């Protein structure tokens, strides 16, 4: 049995070898495409194709690569731009050559700038010379006209130091302004209601007469124009509360607490400003949180009766604590002795400013006492 199988196997190998070394016979046929396909599909075609391939290949590597037709194509490189730029870039010069070229260029630029500067200065000098010549020519032509300069043959220049400045042109009925001393008050809306029109203002001659002698009692002297400037129809502003005035509330002494007394300020450094919760002082017009006075006059209104500690002491020589504990205390405006800028302006007097230091210099403890003494001296001289 085994011998039979060995014979069959040897026969198959022999048949394969015969097919392998069989020569390929070329055939030409004029059959149609269907017939040719049938002939290619026959058994002998596969064997002949295999035999043809075997004969053409001498080595195994050649047989492995046998297959469909391949065409070799050349594709462009990816970094063509970089390569081109590298090729086009010139070689870097050495450091010494770069420094030499840089220094040469700097020297050339400096030389060009110097030449430009020299040319500019020359052109400037030439232009100045031409302008002066043209100006002299024009002036000579102008001087040839008779009566043009009325005897003045020089160019208008700066005034001499010793020459006096001409007097300002004044208009009748209009007050002139003088610096640094200004004696004429500005015509404000509140003052225009009292003085009336501009025609009633003092003339310049009257003001010069007043300035001849020093006004020693300017702070206490009431302006003499108050009575003479007023017409029959002019009525000074009435002292009555307006529609927006806060109602006056009289607080009894029993309602004053110890905390309010401790909250009284003795100097201006202790003040705390608060525009929402603070109360306004009639003298300094500052809205602070410290305790103010309360006027016990039923005819008082608004904030007229509110004074802070420093203002009441320096201006009138009184204390806020004593005013709060006095049931009959009236504020300075109600007594007619208020020396704030608003009340003095309403009475026709100038504002005092910070007068407390001058009052203390003359030996007075407050501004009211100093003004009172000046008023007495003025009345005695009058």
Curated annotation (Swiss-Prot):
* Cross-link Glycyl lysine isopeptide (Lys-Gly) (interchain with G-Cter in SUMO2), where in sequence: 216
Give a Gene Ontology cellular component term annotated to this protein.
Answer: cytosol
Disulphide linkage map: none
Q: Does the keyword NAD apply?
A: no
As stated in the Swiss-Prot or TrEMBL entry, residues carrying the post-translational modification Phosphoserine are 197, 225
> Looking at the record, which segments are called Disordered?
68-118, 151-217
Q: Which Pfam families match?
A: zf-4CXXC_R1
Q: Which UniProt keywords apply?
A: Apoptosis, Cytoplasm, Isopeptide bond, Nucleus, Phosphoprotein, Transcription, Transcription regulation, Ubl conjugation
Out of the domains of life, which is the source? Eukaryota
Output the PTM entry. Phosphorylation at Thr-170 promotes interaction with YWHAE and YWHAZ, dissociation from MYC and sequestration in the cytoplasm.
Motif position, Nuclear localization signal: 167-183
Comp. bias regions, Acidic residues: 105-117, 203-215
Question: Which residues are recorded with the post-translational modification Phosphothreonine?
Answer: 170, 203
Outline the segment boundaries, as ranges, of region: Interaction with MYC: 152-177
Its subcellular locations are:
Nucleus; Cytoplasm
Cross-referenced InterPro entries, in alphabetical order?
CDCA7/CDA7L, Znf-4CXXC_R1
rRNA-binding as UniProt keyword: no
The note filed under miscellaneous reads: Transgenic mice overexpress Cdca7 in both T- and B-cell compartments. At 1 year of age, they exhibit elevated incidence of lymphomas, significant increased frequency of solid tumors and a 2-fold increased risk of lymphoid malignancies compared to their littermates.
Q: What does this protein do?
A: Participates in MYC-mediated cell transformation and apoptosis; induces anchorage-independent growth and clonogenicity in lymphoblastoid cells. Insufficient to induce tumorigenicity when overexpressed but contributes to MYC-mediated tumorigenesis. May play a role as transcriptional regulator.
In terms of PANTHER family, this protein maps to: CELL DIVISION CYCLE-ASSOCIATED PROTEIN 7, OS05G0300700 PROTEIN
Quaternary organization: Interacts with MYC (via C-terminus), YWHAE and YWHAZ.
Protein's name according to its UniProt entry: Cell division cycle-associated protein 7
């Amino acid at each position: 049995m085994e011998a039979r199988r060995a014979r069959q196997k040897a026969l198959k190998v022999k048949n394969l070898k015969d097919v392998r070394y069989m020569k390929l016979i070329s055939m030409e046929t004029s059959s149609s495409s269907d017939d040719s396909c049938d002939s290619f599909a026959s058994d002998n075609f596969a064997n002949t194709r295999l035999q043809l391939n075997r004969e053409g290949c001498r080595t195994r590597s050649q047989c492995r690569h046998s297959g469909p037709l391949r065409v070799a194509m050349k594709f462009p490189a990816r970094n063509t731009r970089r390569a081109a730029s590298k090729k086009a870039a010139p070689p870097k010069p050495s450091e010494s050559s770069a420094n030499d070229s840089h220094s040469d260029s700097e020297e050339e630029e400096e030389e060009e700038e110097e030449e430009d500067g020299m040319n500019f200065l020359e052109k400037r000098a030439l232009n100045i010379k031409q302008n002066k010549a043209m100006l002299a020519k024009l002036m000579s032509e102008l001087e040839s006209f008779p009566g043009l300069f009325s005897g003045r043959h020089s160019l208008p220049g700066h005034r001499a130091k010793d020459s006096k400045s001409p007097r300002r042109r004044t208009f009748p009925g209009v007050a002139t302004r003088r610096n640094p001393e200004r004696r004429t008050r500005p015509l404000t809306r509140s003052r225009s209601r009292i003085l009336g029109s501009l025609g009633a203002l003092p003339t310049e001659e009257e003001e010069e007469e007043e300035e001849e002698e020093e006004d020693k009692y300017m702070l206490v002297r009431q302006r003499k124009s108050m009575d003479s400037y007023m017409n029959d129809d002019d009525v000074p502003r009435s002292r009555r509360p307006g529609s927006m005035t806060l109602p006056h509330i009289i607080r009894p002494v029993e309602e004053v607490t110890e905390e309010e007394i401790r909250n009284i300020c003795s100097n201006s450094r202790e003040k705390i400003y608060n525009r929402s919760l603070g109360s306004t002082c009639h003298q300094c017009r500052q809205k602070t949180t410290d305790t103010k006075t309360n006027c016990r006059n039923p005819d008082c209104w608004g904030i007229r009766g509110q004074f802070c500690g420093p203002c009441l002491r320096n201006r009138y020589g009184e204390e806020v604590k004593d005013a709060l504990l006095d049931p009959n205390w009236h504020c300075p405006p109600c007594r007619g002795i208020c020396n704030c800028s608003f009340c003095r302006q309403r009475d026709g007097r100038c504002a005092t400013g910070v007068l407390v230091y001058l009052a203390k210099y003359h030996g007075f403890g407050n501004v009211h006492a100093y003004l009172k003494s000046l008023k007495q001296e003025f009345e005695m001289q009058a």
